[in-house]
Amino acid sequence: MTAKPNFRLITLNFQLSTFNSTMLYERTLGQWLEHWATNTPDKEYIVYSDRNLRFTWSQFNRRVDDMAKGLIAIGVERGTHVGIWAANVPDWLTLLYACAKIGAVYVTVNTNYKQAELEYLCENSDMHTLCIVNGEKDSDFVQMTYTMLPELKNCQRGHLKSERFPYMKNVIYVGQEKHRGMYNTSEILLLGNNVEDTRLDELKSQVSCHDVVNMQYTSGTTGFPKGVMLTHYNIANNGFLTGEHMKFTSDDKLCCCVPLFHCFGVVLATMNCL
């Protein structure tokens, strides 16, 4: 006779009544960032211990504004789809909040993707700007991007014309290396100096908390991956309520050891800290 497995039934007493509408905040991610940059300017927000990088809320907010103006300079605006194909590098979050402030949609790309998967996602998402790093493990992201966009090596930066990817106009290398046809991070920040603060403020004022801010693709287990549209309201409150139930306070520190491209990293980890 086969013994029955010793399963223990766990009952979760989830009180829906406690989640009334007054607990859900109607703020954009940009507004959340500016709230903490104003109220706790000198408190640390992000620490990269392996790179000896530390940002307070006010320092990070300034870098986000500079990055946002750089994105505006290359044609990114409300509704533009910006992809990030990178592991947890420092400017991953900078680019997320920069997109959020100007109403662009941040498309997260799995770092395990190979050529066909990358091309499918870029085409399906109508991606306008792709941000990349050198690669992960045995994958060369730079070479794979050139394979996908053969026109890139021979075009002026910001003037990409791809027959297969008509929406794609820019590729940004997240770092200081220079690659043909691509901007690097420093060049984007430099271009932002030509954008007036009033233009940034204008775009910020048009963003609603109910706008889509993040597009995450499903794993594709039962078919082609599908882009899931997530709003500012959705992910900010998701992170807030999760943090509330874990009893997080402003004195706690959260170690994010999961990929930021996944919902666990970008929502449950990052948004908890808001």
Which stretches of residues belong to each language-model region?
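Conserved AMP-binding
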Residues: 86-89, 110, 248, 258-262
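Conserved AMP-binding/adenylate-forming core of the ANL superfamily
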Residues: 45-97, 114-119, 184-193, 206-207, ...
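Conserved pre-ATP/AMP-binding loop-to-beta segment of ANL
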Residues: 41-44, 164-168, 172-179, 183-217, ...
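Short hydrophobic alpha-helices that are characteristic scaffold elements of the AMP-binding
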Residues: 96-102, 123-124, 262, 271-274
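Conserved AMP-binding/adenylation subdomain of ANL enzymes
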Residues: 236-253, 261-274
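Conserved S/T- and glycine-rich ATP-binding loop of Class I adenylate-forming
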Residues: 82, 99, 212, 218-221, ...
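AMP-dependent adenylate-forming
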Residues: 32-56, 178-179
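Structural core segment of the AMP-binding/adenylate-forming
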Residues: 102-191
